[in-house]
Amino acid sequence: MSVIDDAPGGASDGAFEAASSGASGDVFDDALAKDRAIPDLDWHVFPEGTERDVLEAPSGALARVRLGPIDGPRVILVPGVTGSKEDFVLMFPLLAAAGYRVESLDLAGQYESWQAGPGNLDPPRPRYDYRLFADDMIAALVDGAAPAHVLGYSFAGLVAQQVLVERPELFASLTLLSTPPASGQVFRGVKRIGRFSAGASPRTGAALLLWGIRNNLNRVPPRRIAFVRERFALTRRDSVNDIVGLMMTTPDVTAEVHAQPIPKLVAVGMHDLWPTEEYAAYALAIGAELRVYPTGHSPCETTPHQLTRDMLAMFAAAP
């Protein structure tokens, strides 16, 4: 979740046409209408038939949900910092109805995986690092049929790209959802305030992120912000600090990701933190298609039908 307006229908039809022309097909399809009709819902509730369990990952027990035919192709949706598996609750029935086995899990230190972390590693380490999140993602991928279609949301997309380079045989496709289109100190490209981020510490950056979310600068509906604030009671602050620090030191794997022959998709809202032009350049650099939606940082919440439509089209093109 960002501090950019994520309200459904927040962009004009003309703006949507400009953002989607040549990218998402027919602008006025039923996916757009369905996204505009999303109600203020209870984000705790997954579709009937959803299975809950835990994945025993290197960092500890990760809370997981799964839905869809057991023998269906796997789709793994990985949330970002301060997020959780519930961010994909609207995508679950759409992917399952299309015949896919859809899964999501909370990152170590986040929401219902709050007890997982570097202290559980062998040997223990002092901080949440990229290796921890990469090994946890690999554990999720190998716990079932491979290769799988992987979506990494924001920070998780940075991790997913590193895992793709390391273990390409585990990926059928890669979707980068609102993933920073940069390496190194990724916040430098954020609209308006990026130039002020150079001297910020991870703790300061995390504090600003949490302040924006808690104060609902996104203007999300009441039940959504209530759920977001509720999960902060479990999410470990040190995990947020460390992840923000990791986003300030992101490895550059652009060329290596480009070299992978799987289908790749960069999916982003036109009001995201980073400029659309930077996303377009990054998509070109890694050999990905670009899709832009009339929303902010959270298309999985606000334009899930359009996002799922475009992912399914990409899956159909996978070998």
Give the location of each predicted region:
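Gly/Ala-rich beta-loop-alpha elbow adjacent to hydrolase catalytic centers
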Residues: 152-156, 160
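An N-terminal hydrophobic leader/cap segment in hydrolases
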Residues: 1-54, 65-67
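Conserved HGGG/HGGXW glycine-rich cap/lid loop of the alpha/beta-hydrolase fold
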Residues: 61-119
